[in-house]
Amino acid sequence: MAIQLDPEGGFVETGGVLVATPGVGGQAEAVHPSPGDSRADAHVSELVANALTAADLRVQVDVELSDLSLGAGGGGPGRGGSDSEPVIVAQVPSPGESMGQVLLLVDEDGLLTWHYPASDQGPGTGGTRGDDLLTYRIPLRTPAEGDGEGRGPLGWLAKKVLKVLVFQVLDDVLGRAGRYLAGRWEEKHRWYGLRTITGSGLGGAPVDWTALTSGPALLLVHGTFSRAATAFSALARDELGRLHDAYGGRVVVFDHPTVSVDPVTNARWFVEQFSAGAPDGAELVVDVVAHSRGGLVARALAEQQDRLALAGRRLVVRSAVFVGVPNAGTVLADPKHLGDLLDTYTNLLDVLPDIGAVDVLQVVLEVVKQLATGVAEGLDGLMSMNPSGDYLRMLNKEPAEQDGYAAIAADFSPVSRDARQLAMNLVADRLFRSANDLVVPRDGGWQIDERPLVPAHRRLSIDDEQAVTHNSYFASPAVQRQLRAWLP
């Protein structure tokens, strides 16, 4: 049964969950998972529900907040005030020492945001019972002013759902697994692989290094959280066939972990396979098409060979096409914004799904689980994209324009009035304060602090009318045309 919220900020209880909404009135009702009650399942899409199941994230309780409105005499701060925006404070029973817990907020416009237990927890925090409670402080998005293009208020009032999820964090053999949880999962499920594609798809045989070094080869390198079969799935079969023929069958996809190890480590593994499989003195000449973080792997192969063990072999990166690559980093990889990175990918994969979206979302959810345990270490692959981090600081210390480099980047703007896409774009624009594809800044694809990395005549800027996001580049006809122009 629904209970009334207290706009004065007092806690109310529903189904064992304490909820305070200072400045906001409305109703709250807990929905526990039970046979025959499908309300909890209806709060997220089938794709997200499947990904949660695959990641072993189980619903502890959903709390529906409905008929929300600004409280008449509420004490919560409002938009533009001296304090922060209004918040929901939820105190949820701990699932126990062997379990982790995280909260997924589902807004009325469908936007999904992850929230983690507050760091200043204590037993019985704010509660009336002796139970251990975990506290969540969830900022509420307030009405957004129009941006000059007729946009109205977004994501405020109406209905929100607090979806509380739990997961196992103890391993019978290894003990507490929260530390480096994502890296351990990635090592088991998303480790390295190399294969030569066929003319009809991205599947293929193991690499024959003798054949690969018989002429120029094309190397496809995927981006963050992804695999080659997902990242390049939008390339039409006839386009893959054309590339296969143009390179004499020497087209290779490079699967690699993107969360737990940095791009140089990825490049080092590739070179180790080359050195082990090719004869002494062999030369490998490659053109690279790299998406997202994969571009940093391509640059490691081209620019950081002093850190690679070529063992008497020679690697020549003849050209590289960067597609949505954070050469100057992305604010989403700043430790303060890792939550925003996970939110962005969760929404992108849900609202604009592609082949393998559930598999990609699984990787995202493993990082969500790790952050929920309070551990941010062991994410070197993500931290390599931090604009102020050590990895990019060293890589971009003396950037020089490279004639063989080319870049494609986009500034996303939704072409529909879909509320969720509008909300995603608004959030990204507030974070980046510059043109972006929701994940990386456009200009950072070809320049570092206004110093060019890619020649001006080898850049493609996709305008916002095409609504290209970070995950949809290869479905764009403009991108496919440009790849044909730049590649043999």
Where in this protein do the model-derived segments appear?
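Glycine- and acidic
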Residues: 250-258, 376-377, 465
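Flexible, membrane-associating and regulatory peripheral segments of lipid-active enzymes
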Residues: 1-253, 275-277, 468, 477-488
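Short coil/turn segments at secondary-structure boundaries
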Residues: 230-234, 264-267, 300-303, 334-335
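Helical cap/lid subdomain of alpha/beta-hydrolase-fold lipid enzymes
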Residues: 149-178, 303-488
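Structural motif
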Residues: 216-217, 285-287, 319
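Helix-loop module immediately N-terminal to the HCX5R catalytic loop
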Residues: 261-284
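Alpha-helix termini
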Residues: 240-244, 277-281, 305-313
